[in-house]
Swiss-Prot record:
Keyword flag RNA-binding: no
Gene: HAT1
Function in brief: Catalytic component of the histone acetylase B (HAT-B) complex. Acetylates 'Lys-12' of histone H4 which is required for telomeric silencing. Has intrinsic substrate specificity that modifies lysine in recognition sequence GXGKXG. Involved in DNA double-strand break repair.
Protein name: Histone acetyltransferase type B catalytic subunit
Region Disordered: start-end pairs: 372-391
Native organism taxonomy: Eukaryota, Fungi, Dikarya, Ascomycota, Saccharomycotina
Biological process annotations from GO: double-strand break repair; subtelomeric heterochromatin formation
């Protein structure tokens, strides 16, 4: 009885207790979630058990789910419903509980009928590590895709901050999925949404056609396949598709985290550099806003994102205009604050902001293929290790 009166003995971190697995023909790759608050609450704690171990496993091909919850002791009342909490976020009636043999038989049976999306939906292919991969643009109207997505969407809650399930009945959603073409394993996917874009009244009145904005919502590469360039290929495939769609006027990203910001910056930088943009950047400093706006529309990027990329290109090319361009933009952006300072303080603050941004650009560019040195050697480590807020 005394033991039951000590809450700390019955409280477990849900992040530590939950173990995820993707099972292939050879082994099971186990990893932990980053977040569990969407399932177990903001505190990410579970009460009422000792030595709690939650195994949530998926077949790496069909994503057929398996759940097994173990513990050495539990309270008779007042304990959290661990199983019920998890099952709310998985397809109803689809989860195999505790019986591993039944689960293996079930997903092996499903594998016999499992097929990749049809070839007409393939939008890109590539090789990595001696294996072949393909990216497909698919829709939830396909019952096979809908079932697969229902099973894997719980990963977005566990690895993406503030993620939520999408409305699978909304036809505006498209999904880009990457598959290993030999094993049929899904490597990762991104959910995307297209909606009507209103720019301003003048352009709306003068335009004969409506345009849409494409938005990347959720983007995930499953943990066993990360750090192998699959994310870059997936992002680039979606951008390539939208760049050819006349009705898409801009591509945006919904609440990106820092890692995705970096991936997007590198991919966009490579795309713009490969297009020959560098040779067309005006020598005027600061760069005219009219040119930036026109080119941002051409590449279907927001003005803020495009301006950042142009500045990265100037740094990459060691352009003497880089520092002047960045400082001019930072001064204009922070004009009201800076004008209230004396001259020496203003110069120091502007230099501090410039140095911080330059280091951040350099850190990103250091991971670009075939990169050149863009910072002196004594600054390179600082750029590699620090993450600065974007300006």
């Amino acid at each position: 009885m005394a033991e039951e009166l000590k809450p700390e003995l019955w409280t477990t971190s849900s992040n530590s207790a939950l173990k995820l697995s993707l099972v292939n023909d050879e082994n099971a790759v186990q990893f932990s979630p980053i977040f569990t608050y969407p399932i177990f609450g903001q505190a990410e704690q579970l009460f009422g058990y000792q030595d709690l171990n939650i195994l949530l496993a998926f077949d790496s091909v069909t994503f057929k789910p398996f759940l097994n919850i173990k513990y050495t002791k539990k309270l008779e009342r007042g304990l959290d419903d661990v199983e019920g909490s998890i099952l709310k976020f998985l397809p109803e009636g689809d989860v195999i509980l505790k019986d591993e043999v039944e689960w293996v038989d079930a997903f092996n049976g499903e594998r016999e009928k499992f097929a990749l999306p049809n070839s007409e939906s393939k939008v890109a292919e590539y090789t990595s590590g001696g294996e072949s991969f393909a990216i497909f643009k698919v829709h939830l109207s396909d019952p096979n895709i809908r079932q697969l997505h229902r099973r894997m969407q719980i990963f977005t809650l566990l690895f993406i901050e503030a993620a939520s399930y999408i409305d699978e009945d909304d036809s505006a959603w498209d999904i880009f999925m990457t598959f290993n073409t030999s094993t049929r394993q899904c490597i990762g996917y991104t959910t995307t949404y297209k909606h009507w874009r209103y720019i301003n009244g003048q352009e709306f009145d003068s335009s004969e056609k409506t345009t849409k904005r494409a938005k990347i919502s959720q983007f995930i590469i499953f943990p066993p396949y990360q750090s192998k360039s699959h994310g870059s290929h997936l992002y680039s495939a979606a951008i390539d598709v939208w760049s050819k769609e006349e009705k898409i006027s801009e591509v945006t990203v919904e609440d990106p985290n820092e890692a995705f910001d970096d991936l997007r910056d590198r991919c966009d930088f490579m795309r713009l550099s490969g297009s020959g943009l560098s040779s067309s950047i005006p020598e005027d400093v600061p760069i005219p806003r009219t040119w930036l706006t026109e080119q941002a529309r051409k590449y279907k990027l927001s003005l803020v994102q495009f301006t950042r990329l142009v500045e990265m290109i100037l740094l990459y090319d060691n352009s003497p205009n880089f520092e002047i361009q960045v400082k001019a933009r930072l001064y204009q952006k922070n004009h009201e604050v800076l004008t209230g300072m004396d001259s020496d303080t203003r110069k120091a603050k502007l230099q501090e902001a410039f140095t911080s941004l330059k280091e951040d650009y350099a850190r990103i560019l250091q991971k670009v293929p075939n990169r050149r040195r863009v910072l002196p050697s004594d600054e390179e480590n600082a750029g590699e290790s620090k993450r600065h807020k974007k300006e």
